[in-house]
Amino acid sequence: MNKIYYLKYCHITKSLIAVSELARRVTCKSHRRLSRRVILTSVAALSLSSAWPALSATVSAEIPYQIFRDFAENKGQFTPGTTNISIYDKQGNLVGKLDKAPMADFSSATITTGSLPPGDHTLYSPQYVVTAKHVSGSDTMSFGYAKNTYTAVGTNNNSGLDIKTRRLSKLVTEVAPAEVSDIGAVSGAYQAGGRFTEFYRLGGGMQYVKDKNGNRTQVYTNGGFLVGGTVSALNSYNNGQMITAQTGDIFNPANGPLANYLNMGDSGSPLFAYDSLQKKWVLIGVLSSGTNYGNNWVVTTQDFLGQQPQNDFDKTIAYTSGEGVLQWKYDAANGTGTLTQGNTTWDMHGKKGNDLNAGKNLLFTGNNGEVVLQNSVNQGAGYLQFAGDYRVSALNGQTWMGGGIITDKGTHVLWQVNGVAGDNLHKTGEGTLTVNGTGVNAGGLKVGDGTVILNQQADADGKVQAFSSVGIASGRPTVVLSDSQQVNPDNISWGYRGGRLELNGNNLTFTRLQAADYGAIITNNSEKKSTVTLDLQTLKASDINVPVNTVSIFGGRGAPGDLYYDSSTKQYFILKASSYSPFFSDLNNSSVWQNVGKDRNKAIDTVKQQKIEASSQPYMYHGQLNGNMDVNIPQLSGKDVLALDGSVNLPEGSITKKSGTLIFQGHPVIHAGTTTSSSQSDWETRQFTLEKLKLDAATFHLSRNGKMQGDINATNGSTVILGSSRVFTDRSDGTGNAVFSVEGSATATTVGDQSDYSGNVTLENKSSLQIMERFTGGIEAYDSTVSVTSQNAVFDRVGSFVNSSLTLGKGAKLTAQSGIFSTGAVDVKENASLTLTGMPSAQKQGYYSPVISTTEGINLEDNASFSVKNMGYLSSDIHAGTTAATINLGDSDADAGKTDSPLFSSLMKGYNAVLRGSITGAQSTVNMINALWYSDGKSEAGALKAKGSRIELGDGKHFATLQVKELSADNTTFLMHTNNSRADQLNVTDKLSGSNNSVLVDFLNKPASEMSVTLITAPKGSDEKTFTAGTQQIGFSNVTPVISTEKTDDATKWVLTGYQTTADAGASKAAKDFMASGYKSFLTEVNNLNKRMGDLRDTQGDAGVWARIMNGTGSADGDYSDNYTHVQIGVDRKHELDGVDLFTGALLTYTDSNASSHAFSGKNKSVGGGLYASALFNSGAYFDLIGKYLHHDNQHTANFASLGTKDYSSHSWYAGAEVGYRYHLTKESWVEPQIELVYGSVSGKAFSWEDRGMALSMKDKDYNPLIGRTGVDVGRAFSGDDWKITARAGLGYQFDLLANGETVLQDASGEKRFEGEKDSRMLMTVGMNAEIKDNMRLGLELEKSAFGKYNVDNAINANFRYVF
């Protein structure tokens, strides 16, 4: 762009025009054509507000103009890295897709360039920019946000091409430099079908749109802004140094869906290409010129772009280890210095006078280098770059100023030099910088890459400050705090794209948060938990610095609230917009400026007051809170409201809010040039994950696009609103200026934009919860209220309501999967829906575990719907009043409602859903499919439709009535109770239909031989085959009622006249198996009875102590199985007699066993003791005797005849004798035939109970088992100097000599007696005993049996003996 040198008055337009120095002669005749290189701006005639006379892009009028703006600023849908972006026209038609490359990052282009258009310079190195050579007029430029201003201090012009590079005064920390293509000026390198698959550009200046008819309309930029778009493949000329594209035809698909034609006003703006080989975007050119058909760019080559940075370096400083430190001396007057190590000296150059560009860069190589400043250094624009590890210190408090520090990847620099007040140390590079100076560092820090560790040390007075302020930007850097005193937290700010503040286990308190965008991150990765306190406060006048700017004749940009001085009128103005027009044209526009008079002090006070008022508005934090920390938010000054529209990731941390309001919300998508609004439709979803949110007399809102995972604990009148419409937006969002919060209301229009909560909410002491949008979790409410208006609420955890209300508002939908427990009633309002189910299986699709719910009532209003299905069990009355409510019990979906839970039979009785309670609703509709309804009291329904279900009237204590206007029943069972004179009643008043329904009757006392009790009454003419008598098992019998049909003038009745019973073999067998469980326990003890004596024959010794542990499993028919653990401890003594060794001893025993079968399950604990003796004759014969007593504590749960769980005690005793003979085949091997007899006693047991009103009893008497065993063992001994091992195997036959007692069963059909059965089995054992040294014995044995009704499946026992 041309530099403006003077303004000339035009008599035709009667206004000033800006004239370039390149115009040889400029007149203002309307017919005179201006030179291509002359750019004129007529402010009055064209009503332009831009500060430069520039023409820029012409784009399609068919596509929303905002898309081109968003594209250029990486806003809206054009976030860097986004793929497959669809472009639509104004009518919503798809124009095309950006699918050849991920979205480029344009942040390296300037966002402002002083009085020049934005985008005409591009950062390609941390301190260097490139533009067109003919572009001039401003030395200041900004990156990321407008306030991040840098000054160009040096230029390198290309002698033959329209391109130049410029050096900045500091390293840029806000953005990453663009990468430059390594192809460079090669003819044909950028043509179609080559390595580069996509071309994007951006720029600023005057803008136009053109429709398909060729009509062009100007877009007024009001200070200038960026637009961008797609460019076709490029052709080369001038030996590849120039590239061109036919961009003039913006409707040619070859130019891409966002084609744009550029004019001279956009000179210097960048052109990017996607390198498909290296998978990255690279800078390939800057705009130079244009024709009527297209545009021309100068190719950016690495050779030329590298010239200026190379020329700005002094000689490389190569540190040599072992030759001492580098002594750095500097002469500020001459701007020169030296670095000396031993006999080697390197010259350096710093700021000379006011010339920052005189300062040269220094590159330090070598490793473990040391530099000591002998003098304070002002290096001007020169920066320090470290390619190795270094330590830089000051001899005696010397300071350093310059362009900044670059630490290369993998390097670590220990920086022990303080800075200067008013200057910031700029740090880039992927390496680490540890700040380790002493005392108070008055300088600031701006970090854009790598890691900075703040570890400043206290001075003699205990004062410490690593920096006066810390700015974190670009999204790349991390700042680590070694302690909490390094920097005032209020002076930490996060700029463009932010970065990480690593707390490192330290605690911080913020009274203000300066976070420009979502890139701001406060994190703690230390194992030591940090606490962050957000004690946000209103600004104080003393904290506010008000710089006074000068109104520029060329217009400019600023931040709303900035103070300006107009020298021509000597008045002060406060800027209300983000930019202002040139030539003072809008100085009287009250929407742009606020006139605050001529008094400087009063003007400053006005600005301060406005900033104070703004800071008292609700607070907002756009950034992130991550890691191992807790966050505390006390009562805040001002309006005590904090809105978080960033994110929270504290999986093991909590956030605590005391009073006031806390809001978690999504974030409105930022669009270029527009202010975010609560009413806009596009929002970004934000995630808030934490262990717990604690509210104390506070209000919490989870608003649109907020997704929260974590528990909430609300107490002392707190309010929780999940799905709130209350949101806050930031008027400064996307500008980098101070947050200016604006309250609004926003309701999601799609389910995906609704708030989404997952967790458990606990309410206490008059707190309240409103569920208005997506909810998944549980609730515990104590003396509180809960309302649900959401149509997508799921309780997948328990819902518990103690002295608390649960209300489903109009149209709400709630599904409870883990049960609802309420001491009060649940209200379901008009058109609302409440569904109770079991817990879905995480492993099996369509499977559920049964879940019980209980309330004091379910109240249904008009058109409300209530369902229990998929293993849901509800104990509650349902009240529908006179409303047309719908009640659904069960589910017809064959693929859902399955279960493999043992509760399916015991609790659910094999049905999909269970209701225990009455239904009252004369106009209600009840639908039952595969459901069970225990209807007690008086129930009433308008219509009842039942399929494959069961309805049990009454509870066996009080008679119940079910009255239905219309009953349709198929394959359904109805169960009623009678006392022989009265019975439960089913009354159908209007219509009866259906078939294959059975009626069962439970008798509350012994049935009479003759009776006549009405069970069912239906309208006259009803089909008498609708109901038939059914048979059910009660006790140990099958009972069938005798039902006759009576027809009267107005009704058809089903009348009970008697009953028939037959014995049920299955129930009797289940009872017999249950009673026989004691025998199996006896048998387990028998198998363990004589183990000790067998050990004595293998390992003889003297007096000693021993211990044994045995674990085994057994099984029998009837699906019986058991497992047991048996422990014995004992002591015995050897008595040496003539021809015989007699062992006598005592033992204590404990057995823990569990058993189950199709009839019952249970557990037994047995404890006892005994005495034994074993005689081992020298001839090889032996004789063993043992007696033992056991006490048993038993708990069994039966699943037959409603026996339930029984706890009882029993006892048994055992007397055993065994005789055998050990024949030695050799000295080491032997054969041992055996015979054993065990006699015992097992105590009897008796049970009495009722099943469906029928009295039952079950008992067996004490009985005396007699068990014999014969067998043979073989064995062999192996020995060494101090050890001996005896291995053996055995085969035996065990048999009952007496039957195992008698079982007596009694029910209404009479007495049934069952004699015990005998059993026998083959026993197989293998084992070994080991003698270790002289006093230790170890043994191990495996046992199994076969061919018995009861068998030992596997048993293993181990024993240990210590000989005295």
Swiss-Prot record:
Active site: H134, D162, S267
Matches recorded under SMART domains: Autotransporter
Inhibition and activation profile: Inhibited by the serine protease inhibitor PMSF, but not by benzamidine, alpha 1-antitrypsin, alpha 1-antichymotrypsin. Not inhibited by metalloprotease inhibitors such as EDTA and orthophenanthroline.
Pfam families, per the entry: Autotransporter (PF03797), Beta-sol_PIC_HAP1_IgA0_2nd (PF24078), Peptidase_S6 (PF02395)
Boundaries of every Autotransporter domain copy: 1098-1364
UniProt signal peptide: 1-56
Phenotype of gene-disrupted mutants: Mutants exhibit an attenuated virulence in the rabbit ligated ileal loop model.
A single GO BP: proteolysis
Modification after translation: Cleaved to release the mature protein from the outer membrane. Cleavage is performed by an unknown protease.
UniProt site (Cleavage): L1089, N1090
GO cellular component: cell outer membrane; cell surface; extracellular region; periplasmic space
The keyword Methyltransferase is assigned to this record: no
Listed InterPro entries: Autotransporte_beta, Autotransporte_beta_dom_sf, Autotransporter_pectin_lyase_C, Bact_Autotransporter_VF, OM_autotransptr_brl_dom, Pectin_lyase_fold/virulence, Peptidase_S1_PA, Peptidase_S6
EC numbers: 3.4.21.-
Temperature dependence: Optimum temperature is 37 degrees Celsius.
Other observations noted: Secretion across inner membrane is dependent on the SecA and SecYEG apparatus. However, intracellular polar localization precedes secretion and is independent of SecA.
Record remark on domains: The signal peptide, cleaved at the inner membrane, guides the autotransporter protein to the periplasmic space. Then, insertion of the C-terminal translocator domain in the outer membrane forms a hydrophilic pore for the translocation of the passenger domain to the bacterial cell surface, with subsequent cleavage.
Record protein name field: Serine protease SepA autotransporter
Organism the protein comes from: Shigella flexneri
Record gene name: sepA
